[in-house]
């Protein structure tokens, strides 16, 4: 009997609307080879029986930028959130705020770097307990508005040198469950900002779109908080160093 193991479960959403993208609309490659993950309703893709080690999943879809994620297969089941960013031909229905961000390292384009962008003002979600210690996976959170307005997925805890990316797995009755334990301690009132992962191209640039003028926090896993960018409605061009 053939045993089937879910090595990775990917939740794919439209990074602009937050709505799920169904697997039938996506073209997928795994480690450079075309593949057909098992597609489940609600924007889920399931990768089965992966060999142990590092893998790279790349997704393409009409109207979106190519997106990719690297992950480690270790015998368990990895949970991955993938946001597809609007690209050429995306059907915007209102005025938008665009950002073209150039990232430099030692005065040269920083190609192939992974950054997280986290806009403020979409909704208010913050830590509601006196202190959350490193290693905790369950947090008491305050959401200004209905809890269902806070989507599951990646968030930036904006906390100076202790800033970090966390994954919100569930949120009910003021209790949020994370996908992995906290790496740092955080005190009451620290904001959780919805975050999306971006990659710079060969020219060190990335493109992002937001619904309205906002302030965007820029974070890199290896460097922490890099910048806080105030964006105006329309076109914005910024350059930051790593």
Where are these regions (language model features)?
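Extracellular beta-sheet/turn segments enriched in Thr/Pro/Gly and aliphatic residues
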Residues: 1-2, 73-95, 230-242
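Structural motif
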Residues: 2-23, 92-116, 120, 210-212
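Short, acidic Ser/Thr/Gly-rich low-complexity loop/linker segments typical of extracellular
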Residues: 19-24, 29-49, 126, 195-207
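Exposed aromatic-hydrophobic patches
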Residues: 44-49, 142-143, 179-180, 203-210, ...
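A short, solvent-exposed loop/turn motif at the edges and junctions
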Residues: 44-76, 161, 215-236
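Conserved, compact domain cores that house catalytic/ligand-binding motifs in diverse enzymes
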Residues: 102-126, 198-225
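Autoprocessing Asn-cyclization modules and mimics
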Residues: 94-95, 100, 112-185
């Amino acid at each position: 009997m053939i045993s089937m193991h879910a090595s990775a479960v990917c939740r794919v959403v439209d990074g602009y609307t937050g709505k799920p993208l169904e697997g039938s609309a996506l073209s997928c490659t795994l480690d450079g080879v075309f593949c057909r993950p098992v597609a489940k309703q609600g924007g889920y893709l399931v990768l089965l029986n992966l060999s142990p080690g590092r893998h790279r999943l790349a997704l393409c879809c009409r109207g979106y930028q190519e997106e990719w994620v690297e992950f480690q297969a270790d015998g368990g089941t990895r949970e991955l959130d993938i946001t597809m960013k609007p690209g050429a031909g995306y059907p915007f229905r209102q005025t938008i705020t665009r950002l073209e961000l150039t990232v430099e390292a030692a005065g040269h384009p920083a190609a192939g770097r992974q950054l997280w962008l986290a806009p403020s003002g979409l909704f208010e979600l913050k830590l509601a307990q006196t202190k959350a210690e490193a290693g905790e996976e369950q947090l008491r959170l305050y959401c200004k508005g209905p809890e269902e307005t806070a989507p599951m997925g990646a968030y930036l805890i904006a906390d100076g040198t202790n800033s970090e990316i966390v994954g919100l797995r569930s949120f009910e009755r003021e209790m949020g469950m994370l996908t992995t334990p906290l790496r740092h301690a955080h005190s009451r009132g620290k904001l959780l900002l919805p975050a999306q992962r971006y990659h710079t191209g060969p020219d060190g640039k990335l493109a992002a779109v937001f619904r309205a003028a906002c302030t965007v926090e820029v974070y890199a896993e290896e460097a922490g908080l890099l910048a806080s960018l105030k964006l105006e409605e329309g076109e914005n061009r910024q350059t930051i160093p790593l």
